[in-house]
Design a protein with these regions (language model features):
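Hydrophobic residue at the +6 position relative to the catalytic HRD Asp in the kinase catalytic loop
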Residues: 119-126
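Residue-level marker of alpha-helix boundaries and capping positions
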Residues: 28-29, 96, 172
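Membrane-proximal basic amphipathic "stem/tether" segments
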Residues: 210-238
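Activation-loop N-terminal segment of eukaryotic-like protein kinases
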Residues: 126-132
Length: 238
């Protein structure tokens, strides 16, 4: 954290070494990807950390390090941290409230046409006290702007698996909690929640990882360049 009051910001620096350094050749740096994605998230109406600026240092076309600057969000902690520290006397009620709020956060992103790529409790900020908290997205370098709704559609499964159906999430949350999470995502639509549950319950980690990698390749290296070429301003005729 740097500065005070409304001017306070958070600066995150990402370093690339070895294979990761070589893979950065000719590509957008992580700080730029996250900066652009946070603006996309804000455009969907989803609360998130506000991007301020980014910078990078390259060598031979590869990124040595990049820095992202975002607004400081006061009185906030990660959802993972909050869930671990809830007092026993109110844990059930507040845990239920927070998980439903996270599911609605993901649903808002998907209705706005954004695939998070890292929909996990550690990447959700809880702003304020848990019982009345507002939730916000805070880490999106792996996100993909799809630009059309993906809520309840095949692409949404990648975020839902990360959010509540990966092996670590299955160990962390009960089946009842995961069902209520899906039901909140589906806005109470039990038929949709059941359909998503059946698909997610059968999904393996290998299938999830391979499918997500293919989806990212298609949208990042095919769809987005085509989109940029179509929206490029034509040169004026001489």
């Amino acid at each position: 954290r740097l500065g005070r009051g409304d001017d306070a910001v958070v600066r995150k620096t990402y370093h690339n070494r070895g294979r990761r350094w070589l893979q950065s050749f000719g590509r957008r740096c992580r700080a730029q990807r996250e900066f652009d994605n946070l603006r996309e998230v804000a455009a969907t109406g989803t609360p998130c950390t506000a991007p301020v600026d980014w910078s990078e240092q390259r060598r031979f076309g590869c990124v040595d390090r990049s820095t992202l600057v975002t607004r400081w969000v006061g009185s906030s902690r990660s959802l993972k941290e909050v869930l671990a520290q809830l007092p026993a006397s109110s844990a059930f009620r507040e845990r239920r409230h927070l998980l439903a709020a996270m599911a609605r956060l993901v649903a808002t992103l998907h209705r706005g046409g954004f695939l998070w790529g890292a929909a996990m409790p550690r990447n959700v900020l809880v702003v304020g006290e848990p019982e009345q908290a507002q939730l916000a997205v805070c880490d999106v370098p792996a996100g993909i702007p799809i630009r059309h709704p993906i809520h309840g559609r095949p692409l949404c499964l990648y975020d839902l698996f990360d959010g509540m159906f990966s092996p670590s999430r299955r160990a962390q949350f009960s089946a009842a909690e995961r069902w209520r999470w899906l039901l909140a995502y589906a806005d109470g639509d039990r038929d949709l929640a059941r359909r998503l549950w059946r698909t997610l319950d059968r999904r393996s980690v290998l299938r999830h990882d391979v499918g997500r990698a293919l989806a990212m390749f298609w949208h990042v290296y095919v769809v987005q360049p085509l989109r940029r070429s179509r929206t490029r301003t034509p040169r004026p005729e001489r």
